[in-house]
Every structure is written in C-alpha cells, then in structure tokens.
Amino acid sequence: MQTILTYRLRGFALLICALVMLSSRSVAQEGQAGYAYRDGEHFVDIEGVSILGNRPIKEIGIQQTPIDSVALKENIALSMADVLTFRSSVFVKSYGRATLSTVAFRGTSPSHTQVKWNGMKLNSPMLGMTDFSLIPAYFIDKATLLHGTSSVNDTGGGLGGSVRLATAPVESRGFTLQYIQGIGSFRSFDEFLRLGWGNDHWQLSTRAVVSTSPNDFKYTNRDKKVNIYDDEMNIIDQYYPVERNRSGSYRDFHILQEAYYDTKAGDRFGINAWYLNSNRELAMLTVDHGDDVEFDNRQREQTLRAVASWEHLRSSWKMGARAGYIHTSMAYDYKRDLGNGVMADMTRSRNKINTIYGEVDGEYYISSKWLFTANLSMHQHFVESRDKNIIIQSGDKGIVGYRQARVELSGAVSAKWRPNDRFGLSVVLREELFGDDFTPIIPALFVDGVISKRGNIVAKASISRNYRYPTLNDLYFLPGGNPNLKSESGWTYDAGVSFAVGSEGKYRLNGSLTWFDSHISDWIIWLPTTKGFFSPRNIKDVHAYGIELNASLDVALAKEWRLSLDGNFSWTPSINEGEKLSPADQSVGKQLPYVPELTSTVNGRLSWRKWSFEYKWCYYSERYTMSSNDYMLTGKLPEYFMSNISLERRFAPRWADLVAKFTINNLFDEEYLSVLSRPMPGINFQLQLSITPKW
C-alpha cells in the first residue's frame, strides 16, 4: 500500500511539474506571433490571429446548457432551484417551498451531481449533495450545466453531470446602487440590495438578500378524509379538508462581498466572500394529525464561503491559482410536548464542517490548432457530527456521531486538437485521491465535426469512465455507516447533433439533440437492517439512458416587437439491473424511485418597447416512491404541469431606472407533489419593484 501511495503521489507531483513547464515554455515563446487570448469577457489584445471563434477549442465535444443571464435576474424571490426547474432538462426534487431542493441529471441521484462555485466545490462532504434552495439566483452571474461525460472536464464524481456557478465583476465606473423589493402571497417579503464602485483597475461589489415568510399557504389535503355524519351518527359522506401549511416559516439572509483588481497587463486578482444565515421550520407532513403547537421541527444553518483568485494571462497561455475556505454550522432540533406543557428534545443534531480549498491550473496554445491544459485541486474536509437521541438504554439519552478528516485531490491533463475548422478531438485524463485511496484513471474522449456549414450542423460524441467515492455519512454515520463500501463507477456514452441558423438583427434559431447511455455499478443505497436502523450497501447496477432535446428562437417580429422562445425535453429511463436481494425483491428491471421518465420545459418572452410578458411552463411525468414501482395509493406521485406568467414595465426618468413586475405562480392552481406527503402551494402572486439611481 505504501508503494502504491508513493507512486500515485509522484503522479500528482508530475502534474504540478507539467503546470510549471506549461508556463515556463510559454514565457520562452512569448514574443513570437501572438494569439488573442480570451477568457469570458476578459481578454488581452495581442497582435495576431484569434484562436477562438464560434466553436471554441476549449469546448470540443462538450454537451452543456448555459443559463441565460436574464433568467438569473428574472425574479428576486427565485433560488437556483427555481431557475433550473424552468430552464433545463434536469430533475429538481423539492421538499416544499423554501426547503431542501436537489438537482439530478439523466436519471441519476443528487449525489451524482457535482456543484462548483468560483471553482470551489459546494457538495456537502457528509451527504454528497447540494441544496439549491439556499443559492439565490441574484448571487450568480454565470451558470452552466455540464451533462454526463462533459463534467470530467471540471471534476470527477459527476456520474450524472455538474453545475458550474460563478460571479463576475460588474464593470462599473463610479458608484452604483440597485434595490429590489418583492412582496408576495403568504406574507412573503424578499429584498435585494447591491452596492458597487469601480474604476479602471478596481471593481467592488456588495450584495445582500433577505427572504422571510410564515409560508402558511392553504392546500387540499388528499391524504386525509373527514367524515360527515347524520343525526344518528351514521357516515353519509366524506370530504378532503382544506388545511394550512403548518410550521413552515423561514428566514434566509445572504451577503456577498466581492473585490477585483485588474492590472490591465494580464493579471487579475479577486476575492469573493459569501455568508448565509438560514432559519427554517420543517413543515408538518400531510399525514400528521397532531397540533403544530405540540411540535418544534427546525433547521438552522450558518455558512461562510470565501475564495481568493489570481489569473495571469498572456498571448497564448494562461495560469491561475485559487484558495478558499468553507465553514458550515448546522443545527437540527425536533422537540415535542409530552403532555405536560414542556417541550422535550427528541432529536438534537449538531454538525460542523470546515473545508480548506486550493487549486492551480494552466492552459497553453501551441498554435490555433492545439490546446493543452493541466489542473490540480485540493479540498481538505474536517467534519464533526453529533446527534443527541432518545436511546432505549434505561431511559437515558445517548450521543452518537463521528469526527473525521479527509483530503480530496483531483488532477487532470488534457490535449485538444482542431486541425481545421470542421473537426476537433479532445482527450482528458483525470485521477482523484480520497484519503489514502486513489481512483483508477478517469479517461474521457470528445470529438466533434461540422456536417454542414449551411445551417452550422455539428455532430458531437464522447465517452468516459467515472467514479464517485462514498460520502462521510456513508462510511461513518452512527448508527449505520459502512466503512467497507466500494466506490460507484460507470461508463457514459454521449452522441448528438446541433445546429444554428440566423440572420443578423432578424432572427436566431439553434437547437440540439443528444443520445446518452450510462451504466453505473455498485450504486450505493441505504436499506433497513434487522437492528432497526438503515445502513448503506453497494447493491445496484443501474442502466440510465435516453435523449435530451433543446431549442431556442429569438426573432424580431416587427418594429420594437421581439419574441424569444426556448424549450427542453428529456426522456430518461433509469433501470435497476442488479441482482435480487431476495425472492421477494421486486425492484429489478424497474425505474428508480423519484426519477421521472419524462421532463419538459418551455419559456416564452414577448417584448414591446418598455413592456415584457413572459410565460414559463414545466412538466414532470409520474414518479414512483418505491423501488418496486408499486401502483398502490402512496406508491407513485402523479404527473403535473406548472405554468407561471409575469408582466414587466420599465421606466426611465432622469434620476433612476425603475422596473415594476407582477408575477403569477402556478397559474392554473395545480395540485401537485414533488415528494410524498410534502404539501406544495397553489396559485400565488408577487409584486416586485426595482430602482437603480443614476448618479
């Protein structure tokens, strides 16, 4: 083991050397014919030819979904979970309004979705997933979804895909201010404030969001029936009661401080610090018959995320380094009145997570035909989990939990080749370390080619192998953790075609169709044991396959009239192909629980002068709640359609830019469930006012 570990560490050392060699060789060649190096909106002008065009060499064969900046700033009340629900083909599983919301690609689980913010992972080292309801859309300036194999370009472990989130400097001159007030149904209030200042070198920004609501919406409880009696106490009829969402209030506060310094000579420095304070009640289930005053079910979280970055850009090469820190303190309390008026602790959970992050990367263009990249990142986690439960042990209370530290290293090198403007090939090799355990090499191959320049028809294909290491809870949670778990592994294949046509100033139409096929072995699932608790096991082989389709249209209809449309559709069978655990096991050959086979979204925006009207629609097919796909009453959740509309008016007096927006959510008052027994709101309204003074 010592020899293998030494060998692998030498491999990472060689990767670091590759980064240094990329930069040193580039310095030696600087002064030759230059190439314009662009990095998003930031670039250095060097005399020469442009190596990036309509098909950037960095994106050879990649299947991705960029989220439009307009969608990110559409509504102050939206989280990234709300944005992705209507703007992508992924499945957003929500436990209710302002509660846990997770994202899953292509029939996989939320822990198979890797999430990065300014390069740093947001996935919980305890659970492996990310709560998108705690990410305000107004705090994100750039968002991109990388599907399947494409996620290997960013990180390992994304068996379904990855989500890349980033902030960006506002590029302002002088002092700027923006304030937004949102008022909605259920006494919901959302406020946003952004202060900024900038000059030729500095960009400073402060953003703050506060969201509060008792969240006591009404709904028809289909899990209960109330009897109607006659005078002789005979049941003559029944009805479903209308109830309020009980114990579902929330208060979320976020503040984001950013500072950027640009030397204008190829170096840029940045600091991003994001603090959140969340206090949320966990609403009672539709099957709860008790009085809400008899319970206190609450989760509190304080998290600080900070990243410092440096970028060094030259004509044909780039280097960067980032360092970061995450501190999370989470508290969960479940209290109950035992009948004497005193609230007693049933569960008292305290979790603390500290993560140290570091990353270096480099890119080097030999010419307009070759790009080489190298990347090495490190996340060092320190986790302390403590749960105080009622234990059957002479009536005493016992404390169980764990304290663990784990380092996670991820290194990758890639070579991208585009010999002409019709063909491209990319190879990525990645390896990761979790504690003392290395994953096998994670390879990925990407290829794309222009089928026809008329219509910009491009074919893409890719293949990769990937691994996901068990989370700390999977390994060490008490009771139930299983230190003998194996890593999940899988092969993923993608193939698709895209097109883009248009006429400048008149219309633009583009779309893509992708087929994917994924085989995942040793799928980890928590199962009940004979000892009365759950424990994770490697039991499933899962075959997830299907198609993804998206299209968008932007057209100028007439003078001052513009129509924008976009839509997504996915068909994602995700089948358990493992062996039966017992003769009674009915899960083999069935769709995985809480994975819709069909999802679809449509967005339309019609603009005229200073008016805008928007319609949003999404659809999820039925989802099974049990691995046996049982059709019993609670065995599946029905399909549902969701429609939202909004009307916006902009005003431009001399002293400020003003925007008024009225939104109707759940336009047709749809009754639906995302998770069994978790109530969801019906039709609701919001008014939003925005002011940006002109200094």
Q: Can you annotate each of these PLM segments?
A:
Residues 48, 80-83, 101-104, 116, ...:
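N-terminal periplasmic accessory domains that precede
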Residues 314-334, 452, 458-460, 487-545, ...:
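Membrane-embedded beta-barrel scaffold of Gram-negative outer-membrane proteins
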Residues 30-73, 110:
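Short, acidic, small-residue-rich periplasmic hinge/interaction motif at the N-terminus
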Residues 418-424, 515-519, 538-626:
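Gram-negative outer-membrane beta-barrel transporters
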Residues 197-297:
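Periplasmic-side early beta-strands and strand-to-turn transitions of outer-membrane beta-barrels
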Residues 28, 207, 260-265, 457-461, ...:
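Conserved C-terminal beta-signal and adjacent last beta-strands/turns
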Residues 81-124:
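Extracytoplasmic beta-strand/coil segments of soluble accessory domains associated
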Residues 120-148, 479:
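Short acidic/polar hinge/loop motifs at secondary-structure boundaries
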